[in-house]
Regions:
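Short glycine-rich, Thr/Ser-proximal phosphate-binding strand/loop in the N-terminal lobe
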Residues: 6, 15-59, 227
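Glycine-rich beta-strand-to-loop/alpha-helix junction loops that act as flexible
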Residues: 12, 90-95, 207-209, 320-332
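Phosphate/pyrophosphate-binding loops at sites that engage ATP/ADP/AMP, CoA/4′-phosphopantetheine
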Residues: 71-86, 191-196, 310-321
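Short beta-strand-loop/turn "lid" adjacent to the catalytic site in phosphate-handling enzymes
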Residues: 73-123, 144, 150-159
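Glycine-rich phosphate-binding loop of actin/hexokinase-like ATP-binding domains
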Residues: 151-254
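Catalytic phosphate/nucleotide-handling subdomain of diverse soluble enzymes
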Residues: 217, 223-255, 264, 327-358
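A mobile "lid/hinge" subdomain adjacent to the ATP/sugar-phosphate binding pocket shared
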Residues: 255-298
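Internal helix-turn-beta structural module
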Residues: 296, 300-316, 330-394
Length: 394
């Protein structure tokens, strides 16, 4: 058993993801997922060593869900009493302008996370619920919050400030906050270590069901695609990404949609799902291979948006040394990497086809030795990053 471990918790509106991490070795000692919180019957999956336990039970709220998780640690292992937990790390999406790093949880921090719910309505409320029940159930362990927005706190004003009326923007705290910052920081740092250089101009593409891009110069973020909320930027699984804000006014006027309906449309029924009915890229590729023109068009739109961001960020940074793919799609979809890189020859990008098609859990370079821009695939590990940040405060 590790000398010190961190229990990392990511609370969603109807789920709790968790992982027991040894920050020193990077090893995940156990992990699991509580699903369908608040429904008639919930499900809990717990993995430890090679064993996987799945149970179904009523999970009326987050407290009941986390209590079930703690029971599973004791019955299935590893015992938390023997794991020497140094901290509980909580992922919180929106830290506003108040948090540029991890923070020890106290009443004031809880209150600030709650006050930021209007800026992160889909994420901060569930995260706060998880924090509160975890502090009740594990009262003798320090709790640390790690914010998705923290890595982007230092964005230049030219990137962070919208061209919205200054008084209105400041009053309602409307600016670019970004998201996935923990992943972007972890991945860009890993690239620097892998290439043995800190003086890099990097673009990181975090491509999962949620997707974001970042421009990183010498380890500091200078731009990112997600904005006030995670809705802005790239085409995503179910989110629009960039869209003319007037579409909101138009739909309100002609379709009679209210704010809740528009929020649902833009966040849950758009993106790849809205374009072709599928937000699973594996299914999209199957349909493309079968000659489905709607799926092909959706993929073209997806790649086009990526291309725009790579080009604009290269201009913002005045060059590009490394282009990195991460997260579920970025790490596993060789075809998307190939299609994007095929259109970046003007940057001197040369993809090594064999390296690109090879699956590996390790960080790796997938460009040719002659490529002027290093292209990499780096598996993200947000849980490890959260655990290591938590350990800096305990």
């Amino acid at each position: 058993m590790a000398l010190h471990t961190v229990l990392v918790i990511n609370s969603g509106s109807s789920s709790i993801k968790y992982q027991l991490v040894d920050p020193a070795s990077g090893q995940a000692l156990a992990s699991g997922l509580v699903e369908r919180i608040g429904e008639e019957m919930g499900a809990i999956t717990h993995k430890h060593d090679e064993a996987k336990t799945v149970i179904e039970a009523p999970v009326p709220d987050h407290r009941a869900g986390l209590a079930k998780v703690l029971e599973l640690f004791e019955s299935e292992g590893p015992s938390l009493a023997e794991a020497n937990i140094a901290a509980v790390g909580h992922r919180v999406v929106q830290g506003g302008r108040y948090f540029d790093g991890p923070a020890l949880v106290n009443e004031a921090v809880e209150n600030r996370v709650e006050a930021l719910i209007p800026l992160g309505p889909l994420h901060n409320g569930p995260a706060l619920a998880g924090i509160r029940v975890a502090r009740q159930l594990l009262p003798d362990v320090p709790h640390v919050v790690v914010f998705d927005t923290a890595f982007f706190q230092g964005l230049p004003e030219a990137s962070a400030r919208y061209a919205l009326n200054r008084e209105v923007a400041d009053k309602y705290e409307i600016r670019r906050y970004g998201a996935h910052g923990t992943s972007h920081q972890y991945v860009s740092s890993t690239v620097s270590q892998l290439l043995g250089r800190d003086d890099l101009k990097q673009i990181v593409l975090h491509l999962g069901n949620g997707a974001s891009a970042s421009a990183v110069v010498n380890g500091r973020a200078v731009d990112t695609s997600m904005g006030l909320t995670p809705l802005e930027g790239l085409v995503m699984g179910t989110r629009t990404g960039d869209i003319d804000p007037a579409a909101v006014f138009h739909l309100a006027r002609v379709a009679g949609m209210d704010a809740q309906e528009l929020d649902h449309l833009f966040n849950r029924e758009s993106g790849m799902k809205g374009l072709c009915g599928d937000n699973d890229m594996r299914e999209v590729w199957k349909r493309i291979d079968a000659g489905d023109t709607q799926a092909r068009e959706a993929m073209d739109i997806y790649i086009h948006r990526l291309l725009k961001y790579v080009g604009s960020y290269t201009a913002v940074m005045g060059g590009l040394d490394a282009l990195t793919f991460t997260a579920g799609i970025g790490e596993n979809d060789a075809a998307i990497r190939a299609e994007l890189c095929a259109r970046l020859g003007w940057l001197g990008v040369e993809l090594d086809e064999q390296a690109n098609n090879q699956r590996s859990p390790e960080p790796r370079v997938v460009s040719t030795p002659d490529s002027k821009v290093k292209v990499l695939v780096v598996p993200t590990n947000e849980e490890l990053a959260i655990a290591r940040q938590a350990m800096t405060l305990v």
